[in-house]
Amino acid sequence: AEIKVRDGYIVYPNNCVYHCGLNPYCNDLCTKNGAKSGYCQWLTKWGNACYCYALPEKVPIKDPSYKCYS
């Protein structure tokens, strides 16, 4: 079966984004989780956050309707 993918801000299980400063950190994080690539998006409403392209559906992405539960 084909793996379903989508783009988004990769999150921890508690819906918190991965904060970042540099693109290589995010690209590494995203590709380790099965994404095509990723980068550090600066100044999102959650701060600087990793964004992944073609991330497998099994890996959670930010759900803006929920808070980050720390």
Curated annotation (Swiss-Prot):
GO MF annotations in UniProt: sodium channel inhibitor activity; toxin activity
Keywords attached to this entry: Disulfide bond, Ion channel impairing toxin, Neurotoxin, Secreted, Toxin, Voltage-gated sodium channel impairing toxin
Major location category of this protein: secreted
SS bonds (residue pairs): C16-C68, C20-C40, C26-C50, C30-C52
Annotated InterPro entries: LCN-type_CS_alpha_beta_dom, Scorpion_toxin-like, Scorpion_toxin-like_sf, Scorpion_toxinL, Scorpion_toxinL/defensin
GO CC terms in record: extracellular region
Tissue: Expressed by the venom gland.
Lineage: superkingdom: Eukaryota
Cell compartments where the protein resides: Secreted
Domain LCN-type CS-alpha/beta: start-end pairs: 6-69
Gene Ontology biological process terms from the UniProt entry: defense response
UniProt record similarity statement: Belongs to the long (4 C-C) scorpion toxin superfamily. Sodium channel inhibitor family. Alpha subfamily.
Domain remarks: Has the structural arrangement of an alpha-helix connected to antiparallel beta-sheets by disulfide bonds (CS-alpha/beta).
Functional description taken from the UniProt entry: Alpha toxins bind voltage-independently at site-3 of sodium channels (Nav) and inhibit the inactivation of the activated channels, thereby blocking neuronal transmission. This toxin is active against rat Nav1.2/SCN2A and B.germanica Nav1.
Name by which UniProt lists this protein: Alpha-toxin Bot9
Native source species: Buthus occitanus tunetanus
Source taxonomy: Eukaryota, Metazoa, Ecdysozoa, Arthropoda, Chelicerata
